[in-house]
Amino acid sequence: MSDFNFGEVTREKSKLRMALCGVSGAGKTLSALYIAYGITGDWKKVALIDTEHGRGKFYADRQDLEIPTGKYMYCELEPPYSPDRYISAVKSAVSVVGEDGVVIVDSFSHAWNNEGGVLDIKSEIAKTRPGKNDYTAWDEAGKYQNNLVNTILAVNAHTIVTMRAKMAYAMELNDKGKTVPVKIGLAPVQRDDTEYEFDIAMNIGRDHIAVTSKDTTFLDGFASVITPELGKELKDWLDKGVNPERCSDCGKVIRPTDTRTVAQIVEGSQKCYGRKLCINCVSKIVRQQKQEAKANENKG
């Protein structure tokens, strides 16, 4: 008997999981807002988590722009930029905009290399934990990073993160034929593999042109300035398919295991607990029941 459970695949409706990377001035925030508005058609269904010292407010209700903006939901995330505070902010934003809304994390880079971020956590572990150093501390610090990324990818709303790009300069000819230094973006300021966690990753240049670097949708080869039209096209694509089964307790999509299909997990949890539950939440309930039973035995 096989240890793996194969079944015919059915495409499910999905949520946007996008990363926008670019140098300072590339237009990451405005691009994220335009995509979010294109998806929702309602600025109050867009929540911006701002770590950029209030700069996220600059784009609100801008009628002077070629494509005007409205009044979106907003929260400034102040230091420390710990993964736990990011997670709390994201979950709060989801509760505000709902499952058809968009949560923008601007910027995700602060969770990595700013005050209270993962690099700070790694250094603190190396300094204070016996037997730990800058190398061995990564095992524990990486769990904070993974938990944050997994939360952003699992919440029941669309999510967009922006990331700063490490900057360098190259000499290029300008329109007058003179050689001048030009700022270029390199890798995102985040863990090396972060952009691969998202379904879509785009690099935005100083000319505001966004180029797809990773894509699982229809955007391979995309190279253009981002407008709300892109959000509309993405929504149409994401809405194709059936609604995935979600856990009634944690809200995450219920995934199959090596031995059980989603249908079997849903049927079993409804029979035993009266609601749809993922395997993790079922395990929590079972552990809690065992602890309560043991406590009752000790009382007896």
Where are these regions (language model features)?
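N-terminal pre-Walker A segment at the start of P-loop NTPase domains
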Residues: M1-F6
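Walker A/P-loop NTP-binding active-site region of P-loop NTPases
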Residues: G7-V97, V102
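Switch/connector loops and helix/strand junctions flanking conserved nucleotide-binding motifs
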Residues: R55-Y59, A111-L119, A168-N174, I209-S213
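NTP-binding/hydrolysis catalytic cores, primarily Walker-type P-loop NTPases
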Residues: G221-P244, G251, Q291, A295-G300
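Short recognition patches in nucleic-acid-associated and regulatory proteins
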Residues: N243-K271
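Cysteine-rich micro-motifs
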Residues: Q264-V286
